[in-house]
Amino acid sequence: MVQQTNNAENTEALLAGESSDSGAGLELGIASSPTPGSTASTGGKADDPSWCKTPSGHIKRPMNAFMVWSQIERRKIMEQSPDMHNAEISKRLGKRWKLLKDSDKIPFIREAERLRLKHMADYPDYKYRPRKKVKSGNANSSSSAAASSKPGEKGDKVGGSGGGGHGGGGGGGSSNAGGGGGGASGGGANSKPAQKKSCGSKVAGGAGGGVSKPHAKLILAGGGGGGKAAAAAAASFAAEQAGAAALLPLGAAADHHSLYKARTPSASASASSAASASAALAAPGKHLAEKKVKRVYLFGGLGTSSSPVGGVGAGADPSDPLGLYEEEGAGCSPDAPSLSGRSSAASSPAAGRSPADHRGYASLRAASPAPSSAPSHASSSASSHSSSSSSSGSSSSDDEFEDDLLDLNPSSNFESMSLGSFSSSSALDRDLDFNFEPGSGSHFEFPDYCTPEVSEMISGDWLESSISNLVFTY
């Protein structure tokens, strides 16, 4: 006891001698009466074994050097200007502590070290356990889970069932796979902690491993119980896309919604078969409705198998750069050829790689540099769409289709663009087509990070060719 008070006097002398900020008010010192709830370790509290405990029995951490210093300085500021708000005092204290020289901080660092050693002596079995913030009101299960889980891991998020599954992530719930690092939920099929929608896509993890893409707002199902999460995602998108789906014909709407489910691995096979079925449904009525519907598709709407970009399509082979690029072109242009093309290729592999398919891809790439070439995107992808559906049973040839498209042209600009993109001797083709082989790598192999909202905006009305439609009226 005597030694500790001597210690306190020594520190007071040091503080008076060395601290430039402290001035005449230092007789308050560390040994004087502390503010209520503070952890000053000298004076009457030195022999009290509960000097660091709150009334509820929680053991507080020992003060660091800044806390030792700011406790003294805060008291002085509160005496000088009692009306100052607490947050303003803290802001000023932080600025002043940063401006302090290291030599001025030494006595406070020593005092903090002394407090730390005393804390270790008084509470030998103390362990720092930060309180877990649990959304629901089950405080009991969270405390038992905190005892069972490792206390040092800040990324743990305690599940409701006694700490069984922890959805990993950066502390505070920002656990997309890029930042947090551990985006898979650990225990069994306990997907409750991971389905918080605060940050993009989450993983409802199945058997331990899940895949998280940080772009689309999809809840990817990573294993066995994938169907429910996929259905929930499709239902949430159905509300957003209701206006867009109203424009589509019947088969196209089914195709449109099956595409959302196709983003999950468990539902991809059924979605590809559904896509081929709806393409086959839409094919007979296509010739009748083509001339009426095509103008809407070319210039305002979504195509007969419109793809909201969420990644690589269902039937597409991820290792095939051509399929990847066609998916991206499909997301950026109103018509999406490659899903029906891919599904027909899945049913008959020989029919998948027709030359017209290559040609549509070449014209897609040829049309991309020009800013006014969005209608030509639509025409070229529509041509490859018709070629893939003709390989699966419809009998339209590319020449008829070109004539139809040229009849439909509203402007000479579009006519020249589509002619230029369809003639294989154009300079754009010669520039861009030199490395175009089915197996060769392409520099367009990046994944597509469009969210459904962005792709809806891209495929929306700003692709109109007349300038009056580009004026926003809202």
UniProtKB/Swiss-Prot annotation:
Give me the Gene Ontology terms describing cellular component. chromatin; cytoplasm; mitochondrion; nucleoplasm; nucleus; transcription regulator complex
Q: Please note every region of biased composition (Acidic residues).
A: 397-406
Coiled coil (UniProt feature): none
Entry remark concerning the domains of this protein: The 9aaTAD motif is a transactivation domain present in a large number of yeast and animal transcription factors.
In Swiss-Prot or TrEMBL terms, this protein is called: Transcription factor SOX-4
UniProt DNA-binding region = 59-127
Associated condition reads:
Intellectual developmental disorder with speech delay and dysmorphic facies: An autosomal dominant disorder characterized by mild to severe intellectual disability, global developmental delay, mild but distinct facial dysmorphism, fifth finger clinodactyly, and small stature. Hypotonia, ventricular septal defect, and spastic quadriparesis may also be present.
- State where composition is biased (Low complexity): 31-44, 138-149, 266-283, 304-320, 336-354, 366-396, 407-416
**Comp. bias intervals (Polar residues):** 1-10
Q: Where does motif 9aaTAD map?
A: 426-434
Phenotype upon changing residue 105 to N: In IDDSDF; loss of DNA-binding transcription factor activity
Name the tissues where it is expressed.
Testis, brain, and heart.
Location of N6-acetyllysine modifications: 95
Lineage of the organism: Eukaryota, Metazoa, Chordata, Craniata, Vertebrata
Q: How is it modified after translation?
A: Acetylation at Lys-95 by KAT5 promotes the transcription activator activity and is required during myoblast differentiation. Acetylation by KAT5 abolishes the interaction between SOX4 and HDAC1 and switches SOX4 into a transcriptional activator.
Please give the organism: Homo sapiens
Q: Which InterPro entries match?
A: HMG_box_dom, HMG_box_dom_sf, SOX-12/11/4, SRY-related_HMG-box_TF-like
Role this protein plays: Transcriptional activator that binds with high affinity to the T-cell enhancer motif 5'-AACAAAG-3' motif. Required for IL17A-producing Vgamma2-positive gamma-delta T-cell maturation and development, via binding to regulator loci of RORC to modulate expression. Involved in skeletal myoblast differentiation by promoting gene expression of CALD1.
Q: Which Pfam families match?
A: HMG_box (PF00505)
Q: Keywords on this record? A: Acetylation, Activator, Disease variant, DNA-binding, Intellectual disability, Nucleus, Transcription, Transcription regulation
